[in-house]
Amino acid sequence: MSVSRWFAHARDDGPEALRAQPSPGRPPKLSAAQKRLIPEFLWHGAEAYGFRGQVWTCTRITEVIEEEFGVRYHKGHVGRLLRELHWTPQVPIRRAIQRDEKAIRRWRREVWPELLRRAKRERRVLVFEDESGFYLLPGLVRTYAPEAQTPVIREKLTRDHLSVMGGMTLGGKVYTLVRQESLNGLHSIEFLTHLLRVAGKRLLVVWDGSPIHRRAAVKEFVTQTKGKVWLETLPGYAPDLNPWDEGGWHHLKNVEMRNLVCRDLEELHQEFHLAVDRLRQKPHLVRSCFAQAGLKIQSR
């Protein structure tokens, strides 16, 4: 615009006419009402739109928007659109399709309170048992490094690991059995014997239906205890009922032992015991694992 035209604008329309006017840009492809419909479509799940698996990606959502509204978005813009709708990328919780959700709800609502009453009535120590593996390969979380310089952690490429049995009580006590070989039924007997010696003379042990718990030798051992050990099996495909699953093991691996790189199994064994000792000093945290599993302990 020439200077003379500026003066003309100012004379005819006043000084406000000289203010810069922002460009309106392209009109949005979707209206606000259409954008609000997107979460409704996504709640139906990815498989409802013909995709394999219930995982949503920006590429898949781009196709859904095109199918529903006839407009094409770049997948990068879809990410911004989702954030605008308060949808964020998250790691999903995995659940086996074989789970019987009704049986699991019934266990929490009916069986668990009855176990608490039995433990109190029969003066048993209630112990949740579970197994897990601890590998030489580190479970890295993050570390600091100069910007744009990805750090390299040197590690020994091996599948060597420690096999661990863990016991957790309502009082916040933790017991473990660590071996460098795969666990079997004899280890189950060994751990039950250990629990009888250090946890209490009468036990109510809750564990899953693992084959190492169902061996004939285990059943025979329990019979020989003459009622000192009562075993309760969790519903199938329900590791979330065990306070070890997302509680004890998760804390040990992702808090106490995160970013840990060990040279060999002996060093890993030492670090594991140090981590367990730190966990034992936090009985309140151990007890919170029961709440995380949806198990109320007020009836104790």
Where do the PLM segments sit?
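Key DNA-contact positions within bacterial/archaeal DNA-binding proteins
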Residues: 1, 76
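Basic, flexible linker segments flanking DNA-binding modules
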Residues: 18-29, 80-119, 139-146
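Acidic/histidine-rich, metal-coordinating catalytic segments
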Residues: 129, 192, 200-214, 234, ...
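Key DNA-contacting residues within the recognition helix of helix-turn-helix
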Residues: 4-7, 79
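Extended, low-complexity cationic-aromatic segments
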Residues: 106-193, 293-300
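RNase H-like polynucleotidyl transferase catalytic core
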Residues: 150-156, 223-244, 260
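A short, amphipathic alpha-helix used for macromolecular contacts
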Residues: 25-73, 120-121
